[in-house]
Each structure stands twice: as structure tokens, then as C-alpha cells.
Amino acid sequence: QSGRRQRQMCIRDRSHSGDINRTIMEQLLMVDALKRASAKRITAVLPFYPYSRQDKKALPREPISARLISDMYVAAGVDRMVSIDLHTQQIQGFVDQPFDHLTAMPLFVDYFKEKVDGPISIISPDAGGVKRATIFAKHLEAYVGFVHKKRDPKVHNEVKSFTVIGEVEDRHAILLDDIICLLYTSPSPRDVSR
């Protein structure tokens, strides 16, 4: 079909490729093609929002890559964006277009209610995820904890030590993180159970 004067959705699935930059570019090219074919409205669906951890400057002269991604999609012609479980809520404010932030949390809540019998502790792997862990724990009537990390600011993605803050003894500990790339900054089950 031509797509002319129709609403179009452009969904990016990263599962086929490990190269996020290529995947972004392919979706931008699809958006551009839809725009040039006179699509009425274009919605970009990004299940995982690329570069979402770079939503602010951590050091001087760093890019705000998550903002740049939004700008690129808008420049290509996107009228609406959809993503799932954003790293931070503020990403929605990077564009003036509608931005739907969906969550998969109900699926996980149902799963753990069915599979886990006994007391639970929801552990955030960092202080920044405590709000997410608290919401999750409320649905499971669980305790909340988090992992305090000691880092070397000069070494990217490396943690020197982990300390668990909260109750985990004699409980099922569920480590709740929003993005796990290489596991360099996440504690192991052994670290959490100490």
C-alpha cells in the first residue's frame, strides 16, 4: 500500500542486531520514507529507548544523547513516540509531540505473585531505582532495599564494592533493574545475599 494520508506506525525491534546505531538509522530512514509518501501521522515505537542513560551531563562537555535521539526522530517527521519502561521520566519532556510511556510492570507483578511463595524483598541495584522498586514492592506487598555502589568516577562501568541496604535475609530477593547491558555494575546474587 502507498501509506498516503494514512496513520503509520514505525516499530523498531533491536533483537536482530547488536548495533544500536544501525537500528536507529534504519528506523529514521523508514520514518523519512513514510513522511515522503504523505503519511498522515507517524508514530515511532521504540520498545527500548536508545541512549536513555545519557539523559543529562555527568561530566563537562558530554552530550545529552537521549535528547539528541528525540531531536533526530522529530526532524525525520515523527508525530508521536511510544516507549516502554524509560530509564527516566524526563525523556518524555525532550519532545513537544505526544510521548506514550508504557510499562511492563503488571506482567512481572502477575508472574511473581504466581511463582513466588513467601516473603519478598525488591532490591534496586542503585539508589536511582528505589522509586521504581517501591512501586513494584507495593504491588507485591514486599520489602524494599537497594544496593549502594562505590565507584571510581574515572573508570566507566566499573563498581569497586556493593553494600545492600534493606532486609533480604530469609526472603526471596528480586533484583529489579531497568537496563542491564553488560552486568558490570549489577551485583551478583551472592553480593545481594550477604
Predicted feature locations:
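Short, glycine/charge-rich flexible loops or terminal/linker lids adjacent to PRPP-binding catalytic cores
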Residues: 5, 52-58, 101-111, 127-173
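Glycine-rich anion/phosphate-binding loops
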Residues: 18-33, 59-68
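Glycine-rich phosphate-binding "P-loop"
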Residues: 88-105, 180
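Hydrophobic alpha-helical segments within soluble ligand-binding/sensing domains
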Residues: 65-75, 102-120
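Short, glycine-rich nucleotide/cofactor-binding loops
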Residues: 15-24, 177-182
